[in-house]
């Protein structure tokens, strides 16, 4: 998290840049950075993050953030790609798409992430569910299905109202 009130994220970023220069790490990225935060990092250090891990799921698809990432060569990684709770998994639109493809709603959502170009790493302790989550490469969502899922996004879609513009992790 950028923790904007503390204002030390550029210093922390510089430490990561140094660690990369010293060969301690190969790639550096951030989590929950908005375009303004990213612009500041890039302007002050000249180094663009490789990845930005952001909240991304059908109820909060972050279209503008993803456009920024694409324009700057930043990989989008989705945290909470399946959202939380059963609301998204029981959504009628997603269930209909899943039924058409003979897949689970989770597989539909993970395929949606893949087709958006986002990296999703769903959490699961179940080996069977982990295998299911990887079985998303034998089908594709069509343009209309992608539009339907994108249309589920809503302004109040954040899981815990953790807005990176004001949220403080510590």
How would you label these PLM feature ranges?
Residues 3-170:
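Beta/alpha (TIM)-barrel catalytic core signal, keyed to glycine-rich beta->alpha loops juxtaposed to Asp/Glu
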């Amino acid at each position: 998290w950028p923790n904007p009130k503390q204002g030390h994220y550029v210093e922390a970023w510089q430490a990561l840049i140094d660690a990369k220069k010293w060969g301690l790490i190969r790639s550096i990225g951030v989590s929950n950075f908005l375009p303004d935060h990213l612009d500041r990092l890039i302007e002050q250090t000249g180094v663009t993050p490789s990845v930005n891990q952001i909240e991304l799921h059908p109820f909060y698809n972050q279209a503008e953030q993803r456009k920024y990432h694409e324009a700057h060569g930043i990989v989008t990684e989705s945290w909470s790609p399946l959202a939380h709770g059963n609301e998204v998994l029981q959504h009628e639109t997603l269930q209909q798409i899943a039924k058409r493809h003979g897949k689970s709603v989770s597989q539909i959502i993970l395929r949606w992430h893949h087709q958006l170009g986002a990296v999703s790493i769903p959490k699961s302790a179940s080996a069977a569910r982990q295998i299911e989550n990887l079985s998303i490469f034998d089908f594709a969502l069509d343009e209309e299905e992608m539009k339907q899922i994108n249309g589920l996004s809503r302004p109040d879609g954040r899981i815990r109202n953790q807005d990176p513009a004001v949220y403080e992790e510590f």
